[in-house]
A protein has these predicted regions:
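Alpha/beta enzyme core
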Residues: 2-132, 138-154, 200-202, 206-217
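C-terminal helical cap(s) of enzyme catalytic domains, especially alpha/beta-barrels
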Residues: 93-108, 161-184
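A generic structural signal for well-ordered alpha-helical surface patches
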Residues: 120, 144, 148, 165-176, ...
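Short Gly/Pro-enriched loop/turn and capping motifs at secondary-structure junctions
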Residues: 137-139, 160-161
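Charged C-terminal helix
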Residues: 177-217
Length: 218
């Protein structure tokens, strides 16, 4: 935890308004219980919060046994907000060179689905949760979807690398045009309207199997 604390303190002194901890611990120890892995995250948050006064956001992956419970505990340990999900280096295999290399570091639009599901569930279960949604956001439509699901804010990274910084202007234009078309004057008027709690059909978020889809598929 020492480096987390040191860097957090230095960043606050440098003038940061808030701090996002991009935390990912690869759980590879077959003898470690899941609670031991989760406690590593809680310890980081607890110790960082002791040395800074600015808001602390924790950026997490979806590799947890029970995400709602884990996020609830992060808040209990002092996290002011949570970002879902971080994207990290992943390996790939080159079958021509017969070697392990790196996969693409950029997200794809299809990655939005996991983020969308958990944005809806987490925001629906805790309406006071400050939730930033990330990964798979490549256009304005994705921004609108995440806000409808309950995101407090939306993060964009891969799209800017691939399309340039102007993509932010394009996304904002789409959002404003969509709001005008639907008659909304502020984001708060529709934020979370389709969350797990407010969608009127929570089963859509809970459903994970394809049986009904394929039985209806022509």
């Amino acid at each position: 935890d020492g480096e987390w604390i040191s860097f957090a303190s230095e960043l606050e002194k440098a003038g940061a308004d808030a701090l996002e901890l991009n935390a990912f611990i690869l759980p590879m120890d077959e003898f470690a219980e899941s609670v031991e892995v989760e406690n590593m995250y809680f310890d980081i948050v607890k110790h960082v919060k002791k040395v800074v006064k600015i808001p602390v956001i924790v950026k997490i992956s979806h590799y947890f046994t029970n995400l709602p419970a884990f996020v609830s505990k992060l808040k209990a340990y002092g996290a002011d907000a949570v970002t879902i999900f971080n994207r990290f280096y992943e390996p790939d295999i080159d079958i021509e060179r017969i070697a392990v290399g790196a996969a693409s570091v950029f997200s794809m639009p299809a990655d939005l689905r996991t983020t969308l599901r958990w944005t809806g569930i987490l925001s629906g279960k805790d309406k006071l949760l400050q939730l930033s949604s990330s990964t798979g956001v490549h256009n304005g439509e994705a921004v609108v979807k995440l806000l409808l699901a309950g995101a407090t804010t939306v993060q964009v990274c891969s799209a800017m690398y691939e399309q340039g910084i102007g993509t932010i202007r394009t996304m904002n234009h789409f959002l404003n045009s969509w709001m005008d078309k639907k008659g909304f004057e502020s984001i708060d008027e529709f934020r979370g309207r389709l969350s797990y709690a407010d969608a009127g059909n929570a089963a859509r978020y809970e459903r994970a199997q394809f049986m009904k889809y394929f039985s209806d598929h022509k």
